[in-house]
Amino acid sequence: MAGALRKTMIYLGLADGDEHYESEQSVATHHDEERPQAQEREERRAPAPVREVVREMPTVDAEEEYRAPVTPIKRAASSREDASGLRQITTVHPRSYNDAKVIGESFRDGIPVIMNVTDMGEADAKRLVDFSAGLVFGLHGSIERVTNKVFLLSPSYVEVIGDDKKASETQASFFNQS
């Protein structure tokens, strides 16, 4: 076992191979050749003088230094500029909760949606309003009640101006989630 470990150490360069061969030789032969081998080993083990190579780096003046050309960065159009191109509003009269897909896709595309739930039952209407509230929350929009069962879903860049805000807050009986 020690022989296998020793061979592995020699193979990996962790031990000298000469010592391994010495142990295999007989004692008599070892005494006769001890001095010449010891001198050879010391000669082999003596580190060779290392020449230092020093390269001088050329000095570069600041004026001669290469500079890449500067590329101006164009500013992206803000969402307020996109709002000036707003030309469309989607009006949806859902009959069931399955019509939520049309509402979600239109709003996701940045189109304001007017949702009229007067033709729906109360349970489905509440579900659709809850869906719409989550939709506008996730896409940073806003939802406003226009009448008792009509709602406006507007994207974040659309500003709705109206005088009836306080009047609509007093009529909050239908969708009060208490």
From Swiss-Prot:
Pfam families: SepF. Residues 21-46 have a biased composition (Basic and acidic residues). Residues 21-65 are annotated as: Disordered. GO terms for biological process: division septum assembly; FtsZ-dependent cytokinesis. Keywords: Cell cycle, Cell division, Cytoplasm, Septation. It is found in: Cytoplasm. InterPro entries: Cell_div_SepF, Cell_div_SepF/SepF-rel, SepF-like_sf. Its main location: cytoplasm. One of its GO terms (cellular component) is cytoplasm. HAMAP family: SepF. Homodimer. Interacts with FtsZ. Cell division protein that is part of the divisome complex and is recruited early to the Z-ring. Probably stimulates Z-ring formation, perhaps through the cross-linking of FtsZ protofilaments. Its function overlaps with FtsA. Belongs to the SepF family. This is Cell division protein SepF. It comes from Paenarthrobacter aurescens (strain TC1). The gene is sepF.
